[in-house]
UniProtKB/Swiss-Prot annotation:
Changing K213E: In strain: E/UW-5/Cx. GO terms for molecular function: DNA binding. Pfam families: HrcA (PF01628). The lineage of its organism: Bacteria, Pseudomonadati, Chlamydiota, Chlamydiia, Chlamydiales. Negative regulator of class I heat shock genes (grpE-dnaK-dnaJ and groELS operons). Prevents heat-shock induction of these operons. Signal peptide: none annotated. NCBIfam families: hrcA. The keyword Lipid biosynthesis does not apply. One of its GO terms (biological process) is negative regulation of DNA-templated transcription. Keywords: Repressor, Stress response, Transcription, Transcription regulation. Belongs to the HrcA family. This is Heat-inducible transcription repressor HrcA. The gene is hrcA. It comes from Chlamydia trachomatis serovar D (strain ATCC VR-885 / DSM 19411 / UW-3/Cx).
Length: 392
């Protein structure tokens, strides 16, 4: 992002390395305990070579520079988003050996290479969310030569049904269909069976009435048109998310307004796609903290942090994972975990792409060639409209 916070704001980091160290250690202590940091506690833990008076003087300068704020109850200091940014930028990813072993064991739950690539990515996001105990989202391109393998109909009420269309690569499309009249449940099941049999080129149920068959053909064409519309017109990445309820265990998000702001940002497809694409060709994690998110969200300060990292097939980025959390995240551990995770995922995806000869396409909302692309994509789709003679 063009206007990310410049660390030159911390004037003392150039003049005196000690004040920089005090800031880093105060932030580290706050991340460890979650409580305002006093000069006495900081001296006892990480700054034994400095007097309490010197630490207080440094605290005062850091307050002036906007890196710390005073807690009016205890008198201790709390890091601001500038402090968390400085901490994230000046600490390499770090995991204890036992943490690495635990994460590697958890990563064995990732699926092996397969053709069901979207489902595998969704499973991977569940594993990552479980490891970090944080909400996770990821962006995904569309994979070519995908095949529709199933259609399901689920009744909502007397005249509306949801159709669920699933593909070989794990994509799922849903929409609502309107029935011309109320149908018995067993009739809807027979129509669903007709759609599935037609899709798989199998004979239809002998119990299917002509009226049910006619309705089935109309519904089939409606499903196909809606699917092809979404399949061909691809203006932004597909976005998947999980683990939103994990935010509730963090003190920051027990405030309803803060929780609503964080979730509103995470749920906004446009904002998240923009954020995930910002550093798509950077192989290391990137943190967006507090006010750094404001340019994407608008005037609202979301008081949270999002950490992103792209995932690769060989040397080609396919999309990115994003992690949402409070600003006081353990950045070193989160960065280290994301690096281990994407390294393992890269191996799996590379094997899948080469074994099954997969290809993909990205959104092209402004590409003039896109206007010619739908016809080509429609011809290559595995699902077709019924011939006119079958509808007569």
């Amino acid at each position: 992002m063009e206007n990310r916070i410049e660390m030159s704001q911390l004037r003392a980091s150039k003049k005196d390395s000690k004040i920089s160290y005090v800031l880093l250690m105060a932030t580290k202590l706050y991340l460890e305990g979650g409580q305002p940091v006093g000069s006495k506690l900081l001296k006892e833990t990480y700054c034994s070579d400095l007097s309490s008076a010197t630490i207080r003087n440094y605290f005062a300068q850091l307050e002036t520079d906007g890196f710390l704020r005073k807690n009016h109850i205890s008198g201790g200091r709390i890091p601001t988003d500038l402090a968390f940014r400085y901490y994230a930028d000046h600490n390499a990813p770090f995991l204890e050996q036992e943490e690495i072993l635990a994460i590697q064991q958890k990563l064995t739950e990732l699926p092996e290479y397969s053709k069901n690539i979207v489902k595998d990515l969704q499973k991977a996001s569940e594993v990552l969310s479980d490891i970090l105990q944080l909400p996770v989202c990821f962006s995904s391109p569309r994979f070519e030569s995908d095949s529709v393998i199933n259609i399901q109909l689920v009744a909502i009420d007397d005249q509306r049904v949801v159709f669920v269309l699933s593909t070989e690569f794990g994509q799922v499309f849903t929409d609502v269909l309107w029935l011309p009249e109320q149908l018995p449940e067993n009739s809807l099941k027979r129509i669903e069976g007709f759609l599935q049999n037609y899709l798989r080129k199998q004979p239809s149920d002998s119990l299917l009435s002509q009226k049910e068959k006619d309705l089935g053909m109309v519904l089939y064409n409606e499903v196909v048109v809606r699917y092809l519309t979404r399949y061909c017109h691809f203006s932004e990445e597909d976005l998947y998310q999980t683990g939103l309820s994990r935010l509730l265990k963090y003190e920051t998000f027990k405030d309803p307004e803060t929780l609503a702001q964080g979730l509103a940002f995470f749920e906004n497809r446009k904002h998240m796609c923009q954020l995930l694409n910002t550093y798509l060709h950077k192989e290391t994690p990137t943190a967006f903290i507090g006010r750094e998110l404001t340019d994407i969200v608008g005037n609202t300060d979301p008081s949270c942090a999002v950490i992103t990292i792209p995932y690769y097939m060989d040397r080609t980025p396919l999309g990115a994972f994003g992690v949402l959390g409070p600003m006081n995240l353990p950045y070193q551990q989160v960065f280290g975990t994301l690096s281990l995770f994407t390294e393992r995922l890269k191996v799996i995806l590379t094997q899948s792409f080469y074994k099954f000869k997969l290809s993909f396409r990205r959104p092209c909302p402004t590409d003039p060639r896109c206007s010619q692309r739908p016809a080509e994509l429609t011809r290559s789709s595995s699902i077709k409209l019924l011939p006119a003679k079958e509808l007569s």
